[in-house]
Amino acid sequence: MLEKTLSILKPDVIKRNITGQVNSYIENSGLKIIIQKMCLLTRCQAEEFYAIHKSQHFFVPLIDFMVSGPIIVQVLQGENAISLYREIMGATDPKKASPGTIRADFAENIDANCVHGSDSLDNAMREIRFFFSDYELLALNG
């Protein structure tokens, strides 16, 4: 099934200047980057986006990391895009990620793990709308 999913290239990717390499993994998997933009999250935006993790011990360090520098948000499209992107991202902990995945090959540690990807169709729709306006999304269909 043709799907869209949200991808975030986290601050570590931009700081280390490996955006092109990460995008190559995405594109080589058959996924298409249909829209992307760079942004700098405010603390409030980061807390809203990751609200589901508010009670977790890693919430504050996650927010601190996500506001530490620019991110790139992308909408990816392809067959089974959600599960495919999660597969090429690799496990959250890069030590447990399979070789050849983004996190195994590029992530420095579990906190600076390079990428975020939606985990379900509902979350993909919600997360895409969090970062992209109706106008931006309409342009994709026009």
From Swiss-Prot:
Pfam families linked: NDK
* Active site per the UniProt annotation: H116 (pros-phosphohistidine intermediate)
The compartments listed are:
Cytoplasm
Q: Which UniProt keywords apply?
A: ATP-binding, Cytoplasm, Kinase, Magnesium, Metal-binding, Nucleotide metabolism, Nucleotide-binding, Phosphoprotein, Transferase
- SUPFAM superfamilies found in the cross-reference section: Nucleoside diphosphate kinase, NDK
Q: What's the cofactor? A: Mg(2+)
Gene Ontology MF: a single term: metal ion binding
Q: Which Gene3D superfamilies match?
A: Nucleoside diphosphate kinase-like domain (3.30.70.141)
CDD domains (alphabetical): NDPk_I
Q: What is its EC number?
A: 2.7.4.6
- A cellular component term, taken from the record's GO annotations: cytoplasm
Q: Name one GO biological process term.
A: UTP biosynthetic process
PROSITE patterns documented for this protein: NDPK (PS00469), NDPK_LIKE (PS51374)
The principal localisation class reads cytoplasm
Q: Where does ATP bind?
A: K10, F58, R86, T92, R103, N113
The record lists the catalysed reaction(s) as:
a 2'-deoxyribonucleoside 5'-diphosphate + ATP = a 2'-deoxyribonucleoside 5'-triphosphate + ADP; a ribonucleoside 5'-diphosphate + ATP = a ribonucleoside 5'-triphosphate + ADP
Assembly behavior: Homotetramer.
User: What PANTHER family does this protein's entry cite?
Assistant: NUCLEOSIDE DIPHOSPHATE KINASE (PTHR46161), NUCLEOSIDE DIPHOSPHATE KINASE DDB_G0292928-RELATED (PTHR46161:SF3)
The text of the family note is:
Belongs to the NDK family.
Describe its function. Major role in the synthesis of nucleoside triphosphates other than ATP. The ATP gamma phosphate is transferred to the NDP beta phosphate via a ping-pong mechanism, using a phosphorylated active-site intermediate.
Q: What is this protein called?
A: Nucleoside diphosphate kinase
The organism is: Ehrlichia chaffeensis (strain ATCC CRL-10679 / Arkansas)
Q: What is the lineage of its organism?
A: Bacteria, Pseudomonadati, Pseudomonadota, Alphaproteobacteria, Rickettsiales
